[in-house]
Amino acid sequence: MASDVRGRRKTKIGVVVSSKMEKTVVVRVERVYSHPQYAKVVRDSSKYYAHNELDVKEGDTVRIQETRPLSKTKRWRVVGRVN
């Protein structure tokens, strides 16, 4: 029932680049796509602040999920590690 109420939340997979804050990590998500006009393969990355209760470390590959705003910049939470 709870999953119906929350709806479908966005998920992303990325690498933890910083874990120096308490219960917060910075996750870099890379996206590779072909440019629509020039057909060149482009690599783009974004950094997300995510709530960390699983004690993940720098260099870990993790899955993050969209959640309610937890602070000024945190809108994601770590769901689990990806191996």
From Swiss-Prot:
Keyword Ion transport (UniProt): no
Family statement: Belongs to the universal ribosomal protein uS17 family.
Subunit structure, interactors included: Part of the 30S ribosomal subunit.
GO CC annotation: cytosolic small ribosomal subunit
InterPro entries the UniProt entry points to: NA-bd_OB-fold, Ribosomal_uS17, Ribosomal_uS17_bact/chlr, Ribosomal_uS17_CS
UniProt KW rRNA-binding keyword: yes
Any single biological process term in GO: translation
UniProt protein name: Small ribosomal subunit protein uS17
NCBIfam families: PRK05610.1, uS17_bact
GO MF, one annotated term: structural constituent of ribosome
PANTHER family: 40S RIBOSOMAL PROTEIN S11 FAMILY MEMBER, SMALL RIBOSOMAL SUBUNIT PROTEIN US17M
Protein source organism: Chlamydia trachomatis serovar D (strain ATCC VR-885 / DSM 19411 / UW-3/Cx)
Keywords attached to this entry: Ribonucleoprotein, Ribosomal protein, RNA-binding, rRNA-binding
Coiled-coil ranges (or none): none
One Pfam family it belongs to: Ribosomal_S17
Cited function: One of the primary rRNA binding proteins, it binds specifically to the 5'-end of 16S ribosomal RNA.
